[in-house]
Design a protein with these regions (language model features):
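Membrane-aqueous junction of the first/signal-anchor transmembrane helix
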Residues: 1-63
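Conserved acidic segment of CheY-like receiver
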Residues: 90-100, 106
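Conserved phosphotransfer microenvironments
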Residues: 138-160
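Charged docking surfaces used in two-component/phosphorelay signaling
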Residues: 104-112
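Non-catalytic signal-transmission and effector/linker regions of two-component phosphorelay proteins
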Residues: 63-92, 191-212
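Acidic, metal-coordinating helix/loop segments flanking the phosphotransfer/catalytic sites
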Residues: 119-137, 145
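Hydrophobic/aromatic residues positioned on beta-strands within the core alpha/beta folds
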Residues: 168-172
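Conserved phosphotransfer cores of two-component systems
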Residues: 131-133, 157-164
Length: 212
């Protein structure tokens, strides 16, 4: 073999060694790299929808409720949804509202993370649902069928039934200056805040903390 060929081989040896070294390192660390990506991949798959679709549902819910969603609000709630996907999966919500069409976007959003959402139109229907199934959270409006205190009356009914589930109020005409009933975990007219509160309550339920 000529001297020129030997010189050329010697010159390419460092590059070949780096390729071999990189290959060995990749094969050695491949399992660790994949495992580090699993939580994020699982969270994205558990969402059931693309993150952008979840963002669109948030925007639709805000539009129906006539509340503004800032870019920071949007980014924050989508980030929580992604990381709380496993906690939300399997959660059960009973939603009491005589206008469920106003909640379609949020219902779709919660169902997209594998939550069960049952909708009823009245307190009497809520009693039947609670008697035949178990739930983690009750979501309710305040005014129903012309009764401005229907939601509050339902709370007293829950007490008589000895049902201690946390109650979230989502009402377009909610006025925090009027105060919040002791049985209400939180109340708001902002869909983004409802999502945060649902995550908060499901975290408590999963980790065994007191709910109310």
């Amino acid at each position: 073999m000529s001297e020129a060929i030997w010189v050329k081989l010697v010159g390419t040896l460092p590059s070949l060694l780096w390729v071999v070294f990189a290959t060995v390192v990749y094969l050695s660390l491949r399992g660790t790299i994949v495992q580090s990506l699993v939580p994020r991949i699982s969270a994205l798959r558990a969402l059931g929808v693309e993150v952008e679709m979840a963002g669109q549902l948030i925007d639709q819910a805000a539009e129906v409720s006539e509340t503004a969603v800032t870019p920071a609000d949007r980014q924050g709630v989508l980030g929580r949804l992604e990381h709380a996907a496993d906690i939300l999966s399997g959660g059960k919500i009973l939603w009491v509202d005589d206008h469920p069409e106003n909640n379609v976007a949020l219902i779709r959003l919660f169902r997209s993370v594998d939550m069960r959402v049952d909708t009823v139109l009245s307190t009497s229907e809520a009693r039947l649902a609670l008697g035949h199934g178990s739930y983690d959270i009750i979501l309710s409006d305040i005014e129903r069928h012309g009764d401005p205190q229907a939601g509050i009356s339902m709370l007293r009914e829950l007490e008589r039934m000895v049902i201690a589930l946390p109650v979230l109020v989502h009402a377009a005409n909610f006025n925090p200056e009027l105060g919040i009933d002791r049985r209400i975990f939180a109340a708001t007219n902002k869909p983004v805040e409802i999502v945060h509160y649902v995550i908060d309550l499901m975290e408590r339920a999963r980790f065994g903390s007191p709910q109310v």
